[in-house]
């Protein structure tokens, strides 16, 4: 095989694959197509999740309530023993 070039080896390998794997090629192509559809749907989902996260950070997609929070403010005296350390 000293006289064979790279492109000739590629053609021989492709012919061998077609000869020995011909019955399996439709199933392999179907699986490849299904994998590509799953991959593209996952990429699309990641993009929409990324946009949602960006909206939450910017405040446009905020779900915070407009109602005030109940509680009380506590001011400690300077004489409080818990503040002295």
Swiss-Prot record:
It comes from Micrococcus luteus (strain ATCC 4698 / DSM 20030 / JCM 1464 / CCM 169 / CCUG 5858 / IAM 1056 / NBRC 3333 / NCIMB 9278 / NCTC 2665 / VKM Ac-2230). GO terms for biological process: protein transport by the Tat complex. It is found in: Cell membrane. GO terms for cellular component: TAT protein transport complex. This is Sec-independent protein translocase protein TatA. The Tat system comprises two distinct complexes: a TatABC complex, containing multiple copies of TatA, TatB and TatC subunits, and a separate TatA complex, containing only TatA subunits. Substrates initially bind to the TatABC complex, which probably triggers association of the separate TatA complex to form the active translocon. Belongs to the TatA/E family. It comes from the Bacteria. Residues 43-85 are annotated as: Disordered. Part of the twin-arginine translocation (Tat) system that transports large folded proteins containing a characteristic twin-arginine motif in their signal peptide across membranes. TatA could form the protein-conducting channel of the Tat system. Its main location: membrane. It is a single-pass membrane protein. The chain crosses the membrane at residues 1-21.
């Amino acid at each position: 095989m000293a006289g064979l070039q790279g492109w000739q080896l590629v053609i021989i390998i492709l012919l061998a694959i077609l000869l020995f794997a011909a019955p399996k090629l439709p199933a392999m192509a179907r699986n490849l197509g299904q994998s590509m559809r799953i991959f593209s749907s996952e990429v699309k989902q990641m993009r929409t999740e990324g946009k949602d996260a960006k909206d939450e950070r910017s405040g446009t997609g905020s779900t915070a309530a407009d109602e005030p929070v109940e509680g009380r403010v506590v001011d400690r005296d300077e004489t409080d023993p818990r503040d002295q350390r």
